[in-house]
From Swiss-Prot:
Biological or metabolic pathway of the protein: Lipid metabolism; fatty acid biosynthesis
Family listed: Belongs to the thiolase-like superfamily. Beta-ketoacyl-ACP synthases family.
Protein name, entry field: 3-oxoacyl-[acyl-carrier-protein] synthase, mitochondrial
GO CC annotations on file: mitochondrion
Organelle transit peptide: 1-28
Native organism taxonomy: Eukaryota, Metazoa, Chordata, Craniata, Vertebrata
Residue span, Ketosynthase family 3 (KS3) domain: 42-459
Active site: 210 (for beta-ketoacyl synthase activity), 349 (for beta-ketoacyl synthase activity), 386 (for beta-ketoacyl synthase activity)
Top EC class for this record: transferase
The keyword GTP-binding is assigned to this record: no
Length: 460
């Protein structure tokens, strides 16, 4: 008769063996894996869905139409709490029930919003719009396991922290919300989207200041390209317009002090004086090319390259010579396997700061040399403001839509330039994107801490 200890040991061992055999069977059946690429090959990655929650409105086509018409979502700040701050404009997502307005209850039940921060709610909305736009609603366990989420957040809403700190100090421990920590975790947007749509592939979150959205899309591109997923729901979200955050950016001398909301953000302009803070969420559905073709998906564009670099210089200021931006763009071009002369459009990071716009302009000229005077460069931030952690994802979406519609979005408010800003910045009005060969673009994102990313996106 076996001892009690030996019987327990055998039961535990048997359970582990059964579990191991079960896992091996699932792996053999490929039920929980994306399709692996052939050795030495990289899978093609296309954009099949776009969801936008921006100061220009909510949706995809509606936002694009407003962008190319030259509309702006920047408005004046209202409220006594902003009176002491030398910034009087911002770019809010329009709230309401009319077309193009954001009504969070269309996406999240009111009972659930108490456990979420505003950027998480916006990310849920943008993801739902993107998945619907892509026509991708995985139901089988295999499809769910092959679909991942990577939605970044540049910074949590500071008022969530400050208000909770005040509550704790004045009312004590028992009044602190049990949802406080989930509200301030930057990965919770990815988590909530994964939970709501049962997406069990890679679950990833990026927080790299204003480069967040581009890094999330770029990382997702590589997840799909290298077989970690067949589909990625990727993007960025930020909603932190508040007196405290505005005060912080203003003290860093990053914000525009222009009081006119229609001209405050003017990338590449001689009188640019800082960025305009915005909010929103942008999510793209990235998909392995053959996977998209098999299901008959509409394809906006293809991501063909991704580059990253670090300035290693200053905590907030860019490298004045644009070296980090140059290396980042060069890395994306190399990753795409193309020549710089094949690029015909750049969606610039250009936030309307004196240093940043000048550095990016230098980097473009350094990389493209004479070809710089042939390509088009525009910044869409004159229309949206600077969406912080959302910016890179929103601008990747705009670049994909530019490829799809063959139209270049304008740089608003650019009615004059300085002598060394002598490129085609698509001033004031949208332009037709004329190209002899494939339409290929770069979209740049640069952030505090010297973090840089460039995506190379091409038409089909």
């Amino acid at each position: 008769m076996l001892s009690d200890g030996l019987q327990i040991f055998l039961r535990i061992t048997k359970c582990h063996l059964i579990h191991a055999r079960s896992c091996q069977r699932l792996v053999n059946e490929r039920r929980f894996l994306a399709t692996a690429p052939a050795p030495g090959l990289r899978r093609r990655v296309v954009i099949t869905g776009i969801g936008l929650v921006t100061p220009l409105g909510v949706g995809t086509q509606l936002v694009w139409d407003r962008l190319v018409r030259g509309e702006s979502g920047i408005v004046s700040l209202v409220g006594d709490e902003y009176q002491s701050i030398p910034c009087s404009v911002a770019a809010y997502v329009p709230r309401g029930c009319d077309e193009g307005q954001f009504n969070e209850q269309n996406f999240v039940p009111k009972s659930d919003t108490k456990s979420m921060s505003p950027p998480t709610v916006m990310a849920i909305a943008a993801a739902e719009l993107a998945l619907k736009d892509a026509g991708w609603h995985p139901q089988s366990e295999a499809d769910q396991a092959a679909t991942g989420v990577a939605i970044g957040m540049g910074m949590v809403p500071l008022e969530v922290i400050s208000e909770t700190a005040l509550t704790f100090q004045t009312k004590g421990y028992s009044k602190v919300s049990p949802f406080f920590v989930p509200k301030i975790l930057v990965n919770m947007a990815s988590g909530q989207v994964s939970i709501r749509h049962k997406l069990k592939g890679p679950n990833h979150a990026v927080s790299t200041a204003c480069t967040t959205g581009a890094h999330a899309v770029g990382d997702s591109f590589r997840f799909v390209a290298h077989g970690d997923a067949d589909v990625m729901v990727a993007g960025g979200t930020d909603s932190c317009i508040s007196p405290l955050s505005l005060a912080g950016f203003a003290r860093a001398r990053a914000l525009s002090t222009n009081t006119d909301p229609k001209s405050a953000c003017r990338p590449f302009h001689p009188q640019r004086d800082g960025f305009v803070m915005g909010e929103g969420a942008a999510v793209l559905v990235l998909e392995e090319h053959r996977h998209a073709l098999r299901r008959g998906a509409r394809v906006y564009a293809e991501i063909v390259g991704y580059g990253l670099s670090g300035d290693a210089g200053h905590i907030t200021a860019p490298d004045p010579g644009g070296e980090g931006a140059f290396r980042c763009m060069a890395a994306a071009v190399k990753d795409a396997g193309i020549q710089p002369e094949e690029v015909s459009y750049i969606n610039a990071h250009a936030t309307s700061t004196p240093l940043g716009d000048a550095a990016e302009n230098k980097a473009i000229k350094q990389l493209f040399k004479d070809h710089a005077h042939v390509l088009a460069v525009s910044s869409t931030k004159g229309a949206t403001g600077h969406l912080l952690g959302t910016a890179g994802a929103a601008e990747a979406a705009f670049t994909a839509l530019a490829c799809y519609h063959r139209k270049l979005p304008p740089t608003l408010n650019l009615d004059c330039t300085e002598p060394h800003f002598d490129l085609n910045y698509v001033p004031l009005k949208a332009q037709e994107w004329k190209a002899e060969n494939r339409r290929i673009a770069l979209t740049n994102s640069f952030g505090f801490g010297g973090t840089n990313a460039t995506l190379c996106i091409a038409g089909m």
